[in-house]
C-alpha cells in the first residue's frame, strides 16, 4: 500500500561555491543517513517536496494538501503515514536539483524549513502520541523528527552564552567541577563528526587526504550553522507560537559556475539586513 516514492537529490551546482558545498554536504547526510534509516526501520519519514511521486488516492485519503504550515510536504507525509500508507525511499535513484547560491535565497529557504518543522510539531505531535497501533519507538522517533529544527534554539543560546561563560569560569573557579562535567557535551559533537565522516567516506572514499578535505568542510559547515542559528531560532520560535508568514519560494538561477554573472538577475538582493550582520558575527 505504497503512497509515496521518494528519490535522492543530487546537486547540479554542488561545486559553485563554499555555500553550495556545505548545503550539499548537509543534504547528503539527510538523504543517505536519515531517510535511509527511517525507511529501513519503518519509522515515519518525510516527502522532500520534490524528486518523488504521490499516489492520488493517498493524498485524498490523508486529507488532501493543506497550506496551514510552511512545510506542507512534511504535514501531508505524517497524515498519510498515520493513515497507514507506506513510503518507499530509493537511495540509488538520483534526481538533479539546484541549490540556492545567494545568502538571501538560503536564508529564506532555511526559514521556511525550520519554521515549518516547528509548525508541524504543534500540529501533528498530539496525533502521533495518541495514534493507536503505532509502536512506541516510532512515536518517540517521530516526535524527535518533528522537533528537529528546534535544536537551533539550543545552538543559538550555546553560541551566545559561550563568551560570558569564559568570564564566569574565570571569576568562579571553585565551580571547576561543573565546568569539567559540561565538557562531556563535546561527545555529541564527536558523534556528529563521526556520522558525517562515515557518510563522506561512503560517497567519496577513505584515505588521509579525503579525511583532511572532510574535516575542512565539516568545520566550515559547523561554523555556518552557528551563524544561521539566530535566523533559524527566530523561525522556530515563530512556528511554535503560531505566528503566520508568507511562503517565500526559493529562486532558481540556472547558474552552474561562478563565471556566470548575477548582476542583472531580478532575484538578487543588494540590501543586507541587520540580522545578516549579526549572523556573520556569530
Regions found by a protein language model. Give the residues of each.
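Long helical/loop segments within the catalytic core of UDP-sugar-dependent glycosyltransferases
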Residues: 2-70, 82, 103-136, 140-143, ...
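Hydrophobic alpha-helical transmembrane segments
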Residues: 85-102, 124-135, 159-169, 220-230, ...
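Conserved glycosyltransferase catalytic-site signature
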Residues: 70-75, 220
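Short, well-ordered loop/turn and helix-capping segments at boundaries between secondary-structure elements
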Residues: 24, 28, 86, 95, ...
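Membrane-embedded multi-pass helical conduit in multi-pass membrane proteins
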Residues: 145-252, 274-282
Amino acid at each position: 500500500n505504497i503512497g509515496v516514492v521518494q528519490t535522492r537529490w543530487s546537486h547540479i551546482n554542488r561545486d559553485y561555491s563554499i555555500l553550495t558545498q556545505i548545503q550539499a554536504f548537509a543534504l547528503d547526510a539527510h538523504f543517505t543517513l536519515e531517510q535511509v534509516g527511517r525507511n529501513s526501520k519503518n519509522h515515519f519519514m518525510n516527502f522532500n517536496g520534490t524528486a518523488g511521486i504521490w499516489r492520488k488516492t493517498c493524498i485524498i485519503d490523508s486529507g488532501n494538501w493543506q497550506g496551514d504550515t510552511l512545510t506542507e510536504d512534511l504535514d501531508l507525509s505524517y497524515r498519510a503515514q498515520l493513515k497507514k500508507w507506506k513510503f518507499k525511499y530509493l537511495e540509488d535513484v538520483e534526481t538533479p536539483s539546484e541549490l540556492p547560491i545567494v545568502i538571501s535565497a538560503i536564508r529564506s529557504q532555511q526559514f521556511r524549513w525550520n519554521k515549518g518543522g516547528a509548525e508541524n510539531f504543534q500540529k501533528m505531535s498530539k496525533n502521533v502520541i495518541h495514534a493507536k497501533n503505532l509502536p512506541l519507538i516510532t512515536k518517540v522517533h517521530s516526535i524527535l523528527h518533528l522537533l528537529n529544527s528546534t535544536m537551533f534554539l539550543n545552538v543559538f543560546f550555546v553560541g551566545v552564552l559561550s563568551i560570558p561563560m569564559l568570564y564566569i569560569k574565570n571569576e568562579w573557579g571553585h565551580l571547576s567541577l561543573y565546568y569539567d562535567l559540561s565538557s562531556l557535551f563535546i561527545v555529541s559533537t564527536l558523534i556528529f563528526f563521526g556520522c558525517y565522516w562515515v557518510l563522506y567516506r561512503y560517497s567519496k572514499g577513505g584515505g588521509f587526504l579525503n579525511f583532511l578535505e572532510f574535516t575542512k568542510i565539516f568545520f566550515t559547515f559547523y561554523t555556518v550553522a552557528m551563524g544561521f542559528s539566530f535566523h533559524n531560532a527566530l523561525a522556530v520560535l515563530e512556528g511554535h507560537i503560531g505566528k503566520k508568514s508568507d511562503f517565500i519560494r526559493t529562486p532558481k538561477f540556472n547558474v552552474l559556475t561562478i563565471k556566470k554573472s548575477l548582476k542583472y538577475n531580478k532575484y538578487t538582493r543588494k540590501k543586507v539586513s541587520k540580522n545578516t550582520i549579526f549572523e556573520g558575527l556569530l
